[in-house]
Amino acid sequence: MSFWLSLIFCFFTFASSSPPDDPVNCEFGNTMCTVTNSYGAFPDRSICKAAKVEYPRTEAELVSIVAAATRAGQKMRVVTRYSHSFPKLVCTDGKDGTLISTKFLNHVVTTNPEAKTLTVESGVTLRQLIEEAAKFDLALPYAPYWWGLTVGGMMGTGAHGSSLWGKGSAVHDYVTEIRLVSPGLASDGYVKVQVLSETIDPEEFRAAKVSLGVLGVISQVTFELQPMFKRSLNYVMRNDSDFGDQAVSFGERHEFADFLWLPSQGKVVYRMDGRVPLNTSGDGLFEFFPFRSQLSLVLAIDRSLEESEESLEDANMKCVRAKLVSSSMFLMSYGVTNNGLIFTGYPVIGMQNHMMSSGSCLDSRQDGLITACPWDPRIKGQFFHQTTFSVSLTNVKSFINDIKALVKIEPKSLCVLEGSNGILIRYVTSSLAFLGKEEKALDFDLTYYRSKNDPLAPRLYEDYIEEIEQMAIFKYNALPHWGKNRNLAFDGAIRKYKNANAFLKVKEKFDSLGLFSTEWTDQILGLKGNVTIVKQGCALEGLCICSEDSHCAPTKGYLCRPGKVYREARVCTRVSS
């Protein structure tokens, strides 16, 4: 079976691999361009175009580009090296806008070991940030697990790791200063460079910490770091019978706690992970298996099996493969090793810079796509939806129990999630950022099958996933992750942020002409229009919530029906003739 081949090859870090393509492709030099994300498709599968792309290498060049576009009244959007956001955050309106890539704004500016601060350009990746800090025995305490994100991208979407400790797990809450290039008046030369900090410009700073790219282009960011430390990691798999209670309190006991929930199997993998003294013995390394380069042939075989299960509606085989994935990943410790080579047992102890993030499939030489990141759109590989939202700790137990109730109705219904290693659940806490998290919460990350070629193809047990999605967002008032999700998750989301109006005031101050705003950002910020798109089959890919059968796939037996546990939900359900 292809999965086992994948596991065998996962033991090796390929010396040659094919890093991802540039998200921007142009017909003539840097003009007549299209832009996409690292998965090759946005939630609505639209093609985003721009008149040109600019690649500034210095802040001076960036200032010149923004001034010229402002003078011309051109729309602008920022695109990062890998463009990992699912929603259309990189798209300009129409085809006449300008894309500003931070691909070459990737330098370290200054390091101050005494003050424990590090200033970098916004195109610096998380990997670069971690490595540069480690040179001075410093560490970023919390970060996402994927190191291919850029500093500007993380701040634009509120990216985070997992913790309730300190200031919480969001990267932007460890930022002390932001340099932002915004449109200006003619008297300003059509551009302004804003230097923002909590002490001098608290309102503007709190807006810029999570900005969705609508305030301008982040040029530089200064981080407040901590002395280097070690972590001790242990994964434990348990029955999920008391998971609702454990989820509420576990994060208070373990600084870097998270969970992998396997609801169809009734199991949870607990991450017991905390700091230990720097002189503790251990040279552990976490290189997450799914983030390593994998053979394109193996990925194609695996995808073909997945497509076959869907077309044949073979839930039994889907569940068998899901158990193989989850049990094998657990047995092989998800890619963590005690010495950088092999896993010999828990606990695994290692330096923070070696334990916090990974993503080696990004970093190797071209090999003609013999190997690639698993989701690279140039090959037949993974293609998926990602639904991610944070549920308040006060509501988490009830939400977990509702999911369990769905599983009780049909135990096979959530095997599709376990084929992607289960529901990843991370801790987040309240942030001073206007569009950051509002309170202590658990962030649920659901990754599941999406048809590559047919947006009107229904998915096996899709009604169960849709009900969880709607239950979280509407019953439990969950906040969507700004850089993930399908359209419907953002419906009315801005009303859940108590400081939304304060953010919009700063937006008006920095970009009164809306040159960095688009139809999409106006929709998610509640300024104009709606994020949902109502048309035939729109509910199948989360573009709408169904209100009639035509929004599903009636010719294939999928009709719009109420939810099974959350009756207010409206989901596309397979109805037997």
UniProtKB/Swiss-Prot annotation:
What are its cofactors?
A: FAD
Top-level taxonomic group: Eukaryota
| EC number, as in UniProt | 1.1.3.8
* Family matches, as SUPFAM superfamilies: FAD-binding/transporter-associated domain-like
State the name under which the record lists this protein: Probable L-gulonolactone oxidase 4
Supply the NCBIfam families for this chain. Answer: pln_FAD_oxido (TIGR01677)
- Where in this chain does the record put each FAD-binding PCMH-type domain? 46-228
Q: From which source organism is this entry?
A: Arabidopsis thaliana
> Which reactions does this protein catalyse?
L-gulono-1,4-lactone + O2 = L-ascorbate + H2O2 + H(+)
The reply on keyword Protein transport is no
GO molecular function annotation: D-arabinono-1,4-lactone oxidase activity; FAD binding; L-gulonolactone oxidase activity
Record's family? Answer: Belongs to the oxygen-dependent FAD-linked oxidoreductase family.
Q: Which gene encodes it?
A: GULLO4
Its keywords, alphabetically, are: Ascorbate biosynthesis, FAD, Flavoprotein, Oxidoreductase, Signal
What role does this protein play?
Answer: May be involved in the biosynthesis of ascorbic acid.
Where does the record locate the signal sequence feature?
1-17
In what pathway does it function?
Cofactor biosynthesis; L-ascorbate biosynthesis
Q: Which terms does the UniProt entry file under GO BP?
A: L-ascorbic acid biosynthetic process
User: What's in the GO CC field?
Assistant: membrane
